[in-house]
């Protein structure tokens, strides 16, 4: 369930699952950087709450491929304990998704708002799916405590025991037309996903983009990035390619998650 209408890119259909939203303080988002927040609010009022907070949404993406296969990019928070950040939440956001029909889950990174929903009540949320994770994230968070460190690493260990987890360290195409691209910086093993149909493509960024301002200023970072400089390098490269080739873009934390990028930044 979502407030966002599905989009089509070629024969690819993309729907969002919106779990809810929270209002986060702008002062915490861009440390050490000078941002014209008043100008940003004028350009994109939908992205802000009042004068000092932005509207942080959590979207997962349901992608139906031309072959008819259903895949997911990220899974949202799910019932990850004890995280409940919502200003407003959606009751049973997955009610319109046949979870047994999902064949692959592309986890962009192991933060709980992206991977927490892979496991529900200790059991696989998507029982017939292979769940894809980059090895660098799996290793980096091996010593974490899930709730304290806000990652779903240990919760997902049950998927490994069941043989449902694919942990790899290369860019790859696990399904025809679905490309996993290593875009480190936010986390060591952060991935973005590019889904193609002929000459058309959609880039599902993960947290490569966290704020709309970063589309025009890819060198700006979020306070949530573990390696800000590496994240900026990943962002510059991928957004340059997206602009050159006219890719559609889907961003999980934007209130309006679908758009594209041009010379002036984020385009709806």
Where are these predicted regions, by residue range?
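Active-site glycine- and acidic-residue-rich loops that bind
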Residues: 111-114, 179-191
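Cap/insert and terminal regions of metallo-dependent hydrolase folds
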Residues: 200-268
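Conserved beta-strand hairpin/beta-sheet module of binuclear metal-dependent hydrolase folds
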Residues: 3-95, 192-211
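Residue-level marker for buried hydrophobic side chains located in beta-strands
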Residues: 71-73, 106, 131, 202-204, ...
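Metallo-beta-lactamase
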Residues: 88-113, 125-182, 230-246
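Metal-dependent catalytic neighborhoods of phosphoester/phosphodiester hydrolases
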Residues: 83-85, 116-125, 261-262
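Active-site metal-binding loops of divalent metal-dependent hydrolases
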Residues: 19-20, 75-78, 110, 136-137, ...
């Amino acid at each position: 369930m979502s407030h966002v209408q599905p989009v089509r890119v070629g024969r690819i259909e993309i729907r969002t699952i919106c779990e809810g939203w929270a209002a986060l303080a702008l002062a915490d988002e861009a440390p050490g950087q000078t941002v014209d927040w008043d100008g940003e609010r004028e350009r994109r009022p939908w992205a802000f709450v009042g004068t000092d907070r932005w509207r942080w949404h959590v979207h997962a993406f349901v992608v139906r491929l031309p072959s008819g296969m259903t895949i997911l990019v990220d899974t949202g928070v799910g019932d990850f304990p004890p995280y409940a950040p919502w200003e407003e939440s959606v009751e049973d956001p997955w009610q319109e998704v046949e979870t047994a029909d999902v064949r692959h889950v592309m986890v962009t990174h192991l933060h709980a708002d992206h991977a927490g929903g892979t496991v529900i009540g200790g059991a696989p949320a998507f029982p017939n799916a292979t769940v894809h994770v980059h090895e660098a994230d799996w290793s980096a968070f091996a010593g974490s405590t899930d709730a304290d460190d806000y990652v779903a690493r240990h919760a997902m260990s049950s998927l490994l025991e069941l043989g449902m987890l694919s942990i790899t360290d290369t860019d790859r195409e696990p399904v025809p037309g679905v490309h996993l691209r290593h875009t480190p910086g936010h986390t060591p093993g952060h991935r973005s996903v590019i889904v193609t149909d002929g000459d058309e493509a959609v880039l599902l960024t993960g947290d490569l983009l966290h704020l709309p301002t970063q589309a025009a200023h890819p060198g700006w970072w979020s306070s949530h990035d573990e390696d800000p400089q590496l994240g900026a390098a990943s962002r510059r490269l991928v957004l340059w390619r997206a602009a050159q080739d006219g890719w559609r873009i889907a961003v999980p934390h934007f209130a309006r998650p679908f758009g594209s990028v041009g010379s002036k930044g984020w385009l709806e």
